[in-house]
Design a protein with these regions (language model features):
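Conserved ABC ATPase signature
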Residues: 123-127, 131-133
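Hydrophobic anchor residue at the start of the ABC signature
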Residues: 137
């Protein structure tokens, strides 16, 4: 389980978060610029908190008091950023295996499950938007992450594609049983995918009590 208690001061917003990430899909909503992306980038190791700590099970990833910092490449995190999500001139296979932290068997399994087997040697830039989203998810899952972080995974898609891709992503995430933070500003999307709903407003992450 990921546990965290940290503050990160950014020019645009100061993010404060204190809690733990349980299994299932946790949706994080909030307005643009509220600090959602900064929060998951701290978990991923792409942004350093100003104060506080982050732990994964018995391993400490961040402890600012002890000046401890585990870099992103040493954390078992699957991160799917917003925006350009594939390397368009690389094949689908090379996109998925880009981190080199998985195995050929894992790649084969992902290609099969994601419906991308026939595109193994196709340049990712030639695929549709929905297919590219599946490539990006495959890359995030390739290293068998302990946590999956998705930053606005449907925002680049037109409305006609969103429902099908959303259902595909949710199905695969649940099948792989990996804890997930799904960031979105779309409330209807949040209601469709999440086991629980966190909010971010002016940098404050609000985590409702469960049970």
């Amino acid at each position: 389980m990921i546990t965290f208690s940290f503050t990160v001061a950014r020019p645009s917003v100061t993010v404060k978060a204190d809690g733990a990430l349980p299994s299932g899909i946790t949706v994080l909503t909030g307005q643009s610029g509220s600090g959602k992306s900064t929060f998951i980038k701290c978990i991923a190791g792409l942004v350093k908190p100003t104060t506080g700590s982050i732990q994964c099970d018995e391993t400490t990833w961040v402890d600012r008091d002890k000046k401890l910092w585990v870099p992103a490449q040493e954390r078992q995190v699957g991160y799917m950023p917003q925006g350009n999500i594939v390397f368009p001139h690389l094949s689908v296979e090379r996109n998925i295996t880009y981190s080199k932290r998985g195995t050929p068997d894992m790649c084969n399994t992902l290609l099969q499950r994601l419906g991308l087997k026939k595109y193994r040697h196709t340049k990712a830039g030639r695929l549709s938007g929905g297919e590219q989203q599946r490539v990006a998810l495959g890359r995030a899952l390739y290293s068998k992450p302990t946590i999956l972080l998705l930053d606005e995974p449907l925002s680049a898609l037109d409305w006609n594609l969103r429902k099908q891709v959303r259902e595909d992503l949710v199905s695969i995430i649940r099948e792989w049983d990996v804890p997930c933070v799904w960031v979105t500003h779309d409330e209807s999307e949040a209601e469709s995918v999440g086991d629980r709903h966190w909010t971010c407003e002016n940098g404050i992450i609000t985590i409702p009590k469960e049970g």
